[in-house]
């Protein structure tokens, strides 16, 4: 075991402790998969990232991403958070405006706009949802069929059952049966905000999002980049969302996550602010 630089970064927020925290071991060299998984299980955060030298010559760094239950090939908030930590720890990208991360899905491009980072959404696979799955999921959510607008399987490295609901209020009212969902699917729900509603701090947000991932030992994720990427690719392509919008997530968990979506030249970019809250060392 040795002392390694370590950070906890709050992602999808410009205000510390209001987003989704991410643990980042800045140098994971020499650790095996079992050691990484055990540490991720111990942190109990949605994801823990281990930064490594890239093996692809086009990449600036490599990230291995773990939930408390298993390693994932890609996730959004770890992509933004690990890039922020890499830059803050002296990382120098090959390009002034772009950083390239190597992870399980290959190369992910990140764009820098001042303090904000955005990643280009990886390729999405979509599929129709079978009633044999949809019915039990709606039951586990306590969701009336009339409140559901559309459903899709969405896979960009993580497989989500995406549900478009009739309103943000419906999204926020859900009281899921997490043990039931654990055996069914990871579920992402999104609903539009009513622009005619009373003024609030989320007036500029177009959608409300929630992510239920009990299968990854995360009953509700505070803010989820991979899910927001997949939802944006689906909804924008099908004309169900504008080309640029802001999504709010984490409201029921007393967070204020903000995810910035932009469609540019056929690509979906998913952006957010991040704040390093803890910086020190860990013995691993």
Task: Locate predicted features.
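Active-site proximal loop and beta-alpha junction motif in alpha/beta enzyme cores
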Residues: 1-74, 80-284
């Amino acid at each position: 075991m040795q002392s390694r630089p370590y950070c906890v970064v709050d992602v999808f927020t410009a205000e510390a402790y209001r987003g989704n925290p991410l643990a980042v071991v800045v140098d994971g060299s020499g650790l095996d998969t079992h050691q990484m998984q055990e540490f991720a299980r111990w942190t109990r955060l949605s994801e823990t990232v281990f930064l490594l030298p890239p093996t692809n010559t086009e990449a600036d760094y490599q990230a291995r991403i773990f939930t408390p239950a298993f390693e994932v090939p890609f996730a959004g908030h770890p992509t933004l958070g690990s890039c922020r930590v890499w830059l803050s720890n002296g990382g120098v990208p090959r390009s002034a405006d772009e950083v390239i991360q190597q992870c399980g899905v290959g190369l992910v491009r990140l764009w820098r706009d001042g303090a904000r980072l955005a990643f280009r959404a990886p390729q999405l696979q979509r599929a129709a949802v079978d009633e044999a799955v949809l019915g039990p999921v709606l039951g586990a959510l306590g969701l009336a069929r009339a409140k559901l607008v559309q459903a899709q399987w969405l896979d960009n490295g993580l497989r989500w059952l995406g549900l478009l609901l009739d309103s943000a209020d419906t999204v926020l009212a859900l009281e899921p049966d997490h043990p039931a969902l654990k055996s069914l699917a990871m579920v992402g729900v999104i609903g539009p905000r009513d622009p005619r509603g009373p003024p609030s701090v989320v007036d500029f947000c177009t959608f409300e999002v929630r992510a239920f991932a009990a299968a990854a030992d995360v009953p509700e994720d505070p803010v989820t980049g991979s899910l927001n990427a997949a939802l944006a690719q689906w909804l924008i392509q099908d004309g169900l969302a504008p080309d640029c919008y802001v999504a709010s997530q984490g409201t029921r968990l007393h967070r204020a996550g903000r995810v910035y979506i932009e469609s540019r030249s056929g690509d979906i970019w998913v952006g957010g602010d991040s704040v390093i809250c803890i910086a020190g060392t860990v013995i691993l």
